[in-house]
């Protein structure tokens, strides 16, 4: 990590509201652009594995993203069928066939990706929205009307189904974006937000909503947890009764956990069938 670069971002962010036009043009804007370029290439990640089975948030990168809005003016962003009026350029602005082939990303008409987002090889972007600072691993499909929020992390070989959303976060700085680890399937119209982590090889069924306050009930153990779905979990929406028995409230239910061999050879539909048994 370039400590000089980190220090420059930290110093500029500490003076966010008092930055002068001269220093923005002379040094801060080029420095911020360098960081955003690093996010696009994958050299930097807002959140990354901590080598202890967890994740760490690089707050200085979130500060750089926020500074991007401070040091850039709103301008015309060319697009079809009509231009945009924004501070953030399109991720693929100025791309030609050579650049698209080098990137290895398939971008379908209607897909919107903002500058500062990263896409691995063989990513497919259907008409969808990916925000600044987001990370999308290789071989992942972002399906129609799906949303990847600012700084959200989506691993390799995942499928974010139609209308699903992965929540991002810029403030507070210490807050983590939603993180979907490798080989996960997120069902249509589901949402994972507020820094929830979905462990690798998990399947989230259609219409499941998980935030930090959502109870996650493990049917096999009876355990209730928050904010984390263990690897190889199959999750659907459900309800848990209130203590007084007068009503029930929404929860996410881990209906089963499968091993690596079963997950590899079993289709998503097969995993989700017979869950009421």
Curated annotation (Swiss-Prot):
Subcellular location: Cytoplasm
EC number of this enzyme: 2.3.1.117
Binding site for substrate: 106, 143
GO cellular component: cytoplasm
Pathway, per record: Amino-acid biosynthesis; L-lysine biosynthesis via DAP pathway; LL-2,6-diaminopimelate from (S)-tetrahydrodipicolinate (succinylase route): step 1/3
Record InterPro entries: DapD_Trfase_Hexpep_rpt_fam (IPR005664), Hexapep (IPR001451), THP_succinylTrfase_dom1 (IPR023180), THP_succinylTrfase_N_sf (IPR037133), Trimer_LpxA-like_sf (IPR011004)
A biological-process GO annotation: diaminopimelate biosynthetic process
Catalytic reaction equation(s): (S)-2,3,4,5-tetrahydrodipicolinate + succinyl-CoA + H2O = (S)-2-succinylamino-6-oxoheptanedioate + CoA
CDD domains to which the protein is assigned, alphabetical: LbH_THP_succinylT
GO molecular function, one term: 2,3,4,5-tetrahydropyridine-2,6-dicarboxylate N-succinyltransferase activity
Keywords: Acyltransferase, Amino-acid biosynthesis, Cytoplasm, Diaminopimelate biosynthesis, Lysine biosynthesis, Repeat, Transferase
HAMAP family in the record: DapD
NCBIfam families from the UniProt entry: dapD, PRK11830.1
Similarity-based family: Belongs to the transferase hexapeptide repeat family.
Protein's UniProt name: 2,3,4,5-tetrahydropyridine-2,6-dicarboxylate N-succinyltransferase
Source organism of this protein record: Xylella fastidiosa (strain Temecula1 / ATCC 700964)
Lineage start: Bacteria, Pseudomonadati, Pseudomonadota, Gammaproteobacteria, Lysobacterales
Gene name tied to this protein: dapD
């Amino acid at each position: 990590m370039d400590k000089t670069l980190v220090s420059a971002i930290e110093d500029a962010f500490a003076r966010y509201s008092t930055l002068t036009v001269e220093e923005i043009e002379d040094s801060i804007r080029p420095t911020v652009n360098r960081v955003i370029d690093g996010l696009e290439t994958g050299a930097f990640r807002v959140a990354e594995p901590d080598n202890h089975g967890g994740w760490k948030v690089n707050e200085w990168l979130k500060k750089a993203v926020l500074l991007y809005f401070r040091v850039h003016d709103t301008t015309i962003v060319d697009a079809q069928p009509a231009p945009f009026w924004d501070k953030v350029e399109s991720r693929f602005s100025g791309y030609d066939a050579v650049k698209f082939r080098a990137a290895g990303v398939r971008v379908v008409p209607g897909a919107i990706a903002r500058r500062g987002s990263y896409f691995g090889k063989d990513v497919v972007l259907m008409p969808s929205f990916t925000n600044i600072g987001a990370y999308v691993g290789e071989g992942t499909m972002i399906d129609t009307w799906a949303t990847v929020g600012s700084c959200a992390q989506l691993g390799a070989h995942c499928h974010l189904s139609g209308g699903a959303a992965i929540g991002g976060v810029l403030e507070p700085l210490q807050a983590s974006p939603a993180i979907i680890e490798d080989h996960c399937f997120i069902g249509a119209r589901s949402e994972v937000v507020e820094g929830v982590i979905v462990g690798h090889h998990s399947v989230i069924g259609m219409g499941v909503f998980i935030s930090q306050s959502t109870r996650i009930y493990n049917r096999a153990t009876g355990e209730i947890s928050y904010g984390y779905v263990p690897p190889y979990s199959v999750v659907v929406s459900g309800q848990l009764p209130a203590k007084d028995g007068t009503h029930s409230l929404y929860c996410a239910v881990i209906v089963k956990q499968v091993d690596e061999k079963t997950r590899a050879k079993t289709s998503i539909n097969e995993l989700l069938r017979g869950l009421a048994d």
